[in-house]
């Protein structure tokens, strides 16, 4: 809607000689704004640039901006900032804890892998008329697991691609497999996805090896 209303097109062009912020310690001053309904987190490296943007919004009058401090939560994701290294990390532990409580699995045992290599979802019998209650519960759990997989636990992506094939014809057995993935999440919910600063000294990639589990 903002694009249709010409909001961004009406922003004034800053002359070249006025684009340098003396207070900015970086070669290029940057302001990144993620627009999502009324939650618009900003990431910037120059306070003057942010203040100029706030002045523009106030002058324009159509959008109000309010500072609420450092980003800690957004759309169910918890963020952490390391002021020393500049690294940013995130996790969804509170969401996983809530899911465990929702499905009565708070005290369940954990698993090292989200789905056993010997599991064969395709061999499970599919009823002609699936139980609507089971299908609804299954679809709800899988949808919640998908959101976690997309944002902070990408290693369960393949398992989710298997589970989503039965969204409208799931049985109790399928539901049990989905809860098995939740058991796995309980064991890894303290892990975080981290984006390191550009000058990180020890860049590496970590991967899961489940074949021998």
Which residues does each predicted region cover?
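Generic low-polarity alpha-helical segments
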Residues: 2, 16, 42, 54-57, ...
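Intrinsically disordered, low-complexity segments enriched in polar/charged residues with Gly/Pro
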Residues: 2-5, 28, 66, 76, ...
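Glycine- and Gly-Pro-enriched alpha-helical subdomains that act as flexible
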Residues: 1-21
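Polymerase palm active-site segment centered on the conserved acidic dipeptide of motif C
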Residues: 5-12, 41-103, 182, 186-194
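Divalent metal-binding acidic/histidine catalytic loops
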Residues: 20-33, 38, 85-87, 91, ...
